[in-house]
Amino acid sequence: MIRTPTRTKTLSFAGPQVDFHFPSPESAPNGSLDNYHMSNHHLLNDAVARSPSQNSSGTSNGVDSAHYSFANISDNTTGVRNAGNGKRSSQAPSWSSGSGSCRRYPVTLAPITNASALARPGDSGAADVRKNDTAAFLRRKRSPEDCALHSISTSAYTIPTADNISFQITFGSSDKSHSLGSLRRSPSFGRRLPSRRTAGSSNNAPVSASLPARAASVKSTQSTLKRSQAVRCKGGLLQFFMQVGVRAKNRIRRWRLAVRKKLFTYKAKRLAKKNKKQTTSHLKRGNGYVSNIQRSISSASLRNSQRKNSDSASKETPATVARSGTLPNPLETPPKTTRKSLRRSPSSIKRAASILTRANSSGTITQGTAEKNNAGENIPRTKLVRSGPSLSLSSIARQPSIVVNNKVIPLTSLNEDTKDFTIEEEDEDEYVIDTDCMKKSVRGYSQSSSGSSNSGKSSDETYHDSLENPTPDESLLPDEKVSRALDAWNHYLRAVVAQRVLMRLQIRRFQESGGDPECQELIDAIISDYEENSSSHCDSDLRSDSTSLTSVSDCEGRVSSSVASDVSVGITGSIFSARPFQQTMKNSVKRSLTLPVGFRV
């Protein structure tokens, strides 16, 4: 049976193998062959030995060469481990000096390359090898217990694989030089099982000149894996230093935890001493506290106190001069009238805007109001409290003030003689207004609305503005409160109605002059909306005030009768129906602008 493979190349053994032939009976040795000689393994070996080729692997050990060694199986994933490395004398096989009985079966079916490099002795040496192999084979055949212990087909004469590669194969038809050459290329096998040597291995010691002479004297003890110096030192200094390092690391970790617990625990008593030095309060720090007494004293009160001192000193000077004859010391220069700007903070603004009076304000009257009362002016005393000079901030009563755009304007700093209330009214919603008096007056008006008709006849000259002459609630009776509230309301209605009538008269003049038609339409739209808004609010007030405004009401009636024909379009054609104009009016016009102080809508 001759099989020629169809493949022409394989990468497993580095080269073409076209001349490879499987073993067959034609390649068997001359002479009659028994069952043993007809077995597959030695026929393969004979065919490989008798057909030398240049196409073979450099190593014969399948495990060391990182290839599967039988039937040309290879994964081609790893390289040869010992490729290109020269073999040292210590790596020579320990059983390579034996005879043919020590030879083992080649572990690959690939043909052998480098045939010239193999040490081939003469024909006499080959004949001696064959004789020794035959003698060893006959001895095995004659011993029954050896056959019982080691089966020829399973143990001693099996094809080597990764499992049973350590078994030795002895036969009489192989070439000694080839087997020795293959053993020389695979030194790792001699290290693994040196105890498989036979008795006749010492006869053929000088097989090749390249083999060392001391290879036969190597002991047959099983060697262990080679370890580095660091691993050998594991049980010595290296292990000692490793344990020292582990113990030191654990100790440092415990110390670190103890220090952190000691420093950052708050349950135990703190070792740090508390500083008992008194510091400024959080209120003073938040409000920008400055240890300056003049900040807590109004300049007006200081001036008043200095005037008192100067008057008393001027009265005493003539007597003292007459007695002593010396002039008194000149008075010190008065403080500057310029008031420093207040340092503002949220808390200071709230305190300054709050309206508080002294506890004894009902029994004390300031100097200015006393002088005015003595002069004969029937002006009720104001609610404003002027603070006297003091050295402590806590004893000064908070002055009534007003807040405009985050600026505190104390009402005591205003000039009461000229009534100079110059406050820019940018946004009336920010004003702080006390509405308690108005609420009380509204309640009194609701209770005594039936008998309050006679109080509405008071004249316009007796009305005083609430901002100019505020009166405390304690000095007024309920009837007086109701009458004053009605007077203020009637004054408001008369002023508003008069302004509206004057505007209508002016519009009438523009109409009679004959202007632009677009201007005429605009005037008509304004008049229509104005009439609808004002008629419902002012009918009752106009009836009550008809006596004082007879001429104005007649003019208003003439204007309304003459313009009634032009304003037949109604609210649908008014200018206020336009969306942009409505948005502008909604954002700019505020109802509280046309109400007296103290009323809210």
Curated annotation (Swiss-Prot):
Region Disordered, as annotated, extends over: 1-38, 77-101, 174-214, 271-386, 443-478
Q: List the disulfide bonds.
A: none
Q: Where is the composition biased (Basic and acidic residues)?
A: 458-467
Q: Where do Basic residues bias regions lie?
A: 271-285
Domain of life, per lineage: Eukaryota
Q: Where is the composition biased (Polar residues)?
A: 1-11, 198-207, 289-304, 357-376
Gene Ontology cellular component annotations, sorted alphabetically: cellular bud neck
Q: Where in the cell is it found?
A: Bud neck
- Low complexity: bias regions: 89-101, 443-457
Q: Which family does it belong to?
A: Belongs to the AIM44 family.
- What protein name is recorded for this chain? Altered inheritance of mitochondria protein 44
Q: What is the lineage of its organism?
A: Eukaryota, Fungi, Dikarya, Ascomycota, Saccharomycotina
